[in-house]
């Protein structure tokens, strides 16, 4: 028995040491001592008044004013008072966040400069969103601008990336004191079951894949005014230059949703051709199939779109909801969807010459050998392809109004 215990003793000692290592907090950092960063905005370089005043007092270092980063930190004082939980929204309450802007030519060095202005360590593992202005996206390749984010092992690749019209830092401001703008921006994307003009989230992880593939892609755009923010349209990023080449408005962004068949909900509004009255179709399901066709050297596509949904608004109350009337309404909605799809196809195929709707993926899967020949100049091939489309809408429910 003693010899058995003797043999097991070294193993028991090792287990005990491992347990101490696992349960210990030797490298832990108190959350109160950390500057939790929830959002970063990237704008073209323009020193803030605070930076200029600090510079006059000697607080500067050698740099070019290429970009301005705005860090959004949680306001520890407000959090201690309970405002970050949604309370304290009165006039005298503190905002739940603090924004600090710094200008320079290196994201890493800008972060170091921010640390000279904060009494807490800049802590990025909780970074939720990066917002880039259109000016930045037009000027700098996005892979170069986000290189530091990709390399920083503190930053999670689930972080959302957005574009912004105007200054990106404006998207990190809210009128309400009790809410943190970063969480508002994330929350807007979660309304995709209600709105078909919201794109699937573009995270840092997805962005890496897009950049490596060389494909053109979209970034959800956000606009800001007077402390209010809204998802509105998308930025078109060219796969070769990695720069922004244009925008899609909300209507055109909805067209991308129909082509891809990615919508989880939304509303199509139109007008009955006969009565000219407003009607609204609530989307329950969208299904889309992009079919590539190759004949000799010619490449074409047909997009087959199907949808089911409910008639949720009908201002024409004089006509009975009979089969003939319903068929007419379905045709009206189908024509509206065709209009939406046609407009965005013209924009991406002929104006921007950028496939941001997934035609490349369909072609690659259907013709893998041909894909190897055309993938390097796919956007050019896409811009010359004939594209047809069909739409079939089925109204399945009519609300609580009974059919006459």
From Swiss-Prot:
Residues with a covalently attached lipid (N-palmitoyl cysteine): 25
Cellular localisation: Cell membrane
Keywords linked to the UniProt accession: Cell membrane, Germination, Lipoprotein, Membrane, Palmitate, Signal
Its membrane topology: Lipid-anchor
Pfam family, one: Spore_GerAC_N
Keyword Manganese in record: no
Cleavable signal peptide: 1-24
Lipidated positions per record (S-diacylglycerol cysteine): 25
Database matches in InterPro entries: Spore_GerAC-like, Spore_GerAC-like_C, Spore_GerAC_C_sf
Gene Ontology terms describing biological process: spore germination
Record's function text: May be involved in spore germination.
Classification via NCBIfam families: spore_ger_x_C
Annotated family: Belongs to the GerABKC lipoprotein family.
Name of protein: Spore germination protein YndF
